[in-house]
Amino acid sequence: GERLSEADLDALVDMLASLHRAFVGFQDDGLFTNRAMRELNHQHIFRVPLDASNGLDLDALTPGLSGAATKLREDTDFVAAVETLGRVYLRDGGTLLHGDFFPGSWLRTAEGPRIIDPEFCFLGAPEFDVGVLVAHLLLADQPPAIVDRALTGYAERIGTRPDEASRALVMRFAGVEMMRRLIGVAQLPLTASLARKRTWLRQVREMVSSAARQTRSSGGGG
């Protein structure tokens, strides 16, 4: 994908961190619960991609992709880890999230990036927003240094120390977002071969399952 400049990345991370900081501990009166939207998105993010009867012909998109999807769907540990993440996503939190922080919600302007689509906002786990950002950096083949810059820059702007459990949760959410963009109905205009998509799906399995094991061993997670 097109390389994201460090300046644009920093601006995106700054906007996300500013949103999260501004509403830490916010006492919601129901305005930002956004339950109906969140439940709809939960289906599309965590359930539909793993449902073989979702009506999506993956082989029409990329011949052979349905077989790769079946292998992922038959991995019971992976499916269980995704279900656990889905429960974390639905759990009310104390941070206002954008809720759909991917390139389709970013506008490039002469004054720098701008963010749209606030209708997805809800109070939840901030790692979800960061995970979505990381997922799309990976799907755009951004270099590892850009991903590290995003994660480090976010932590610095939030003012938190490095937290292995939080980082693991970010990567788990990133893996699920990649999965739903590869084998779910919310497809991206990716010009990628079957081999490339298989590689991404192997990465997805590792990100979700290994990060889940890491979280359990450290005593964190949902």
Regions found by a protein language model. Name each.
Residues 1-32:
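ATP-binding pocket architecture of kinase catalytic cores
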Residues 30-86, 183:
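Active-site catalytic-loop/activation-segment of kinase and kinase-like phosphoryl-transfer enzymes
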Residues 145, 175-222:
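ATP/Mg2+ or Mg2+-diphosphate-binding catalytic cores
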Residues 159-169:
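Acidic, serine/threonine- and proline-rich low-complexity regulatory regions
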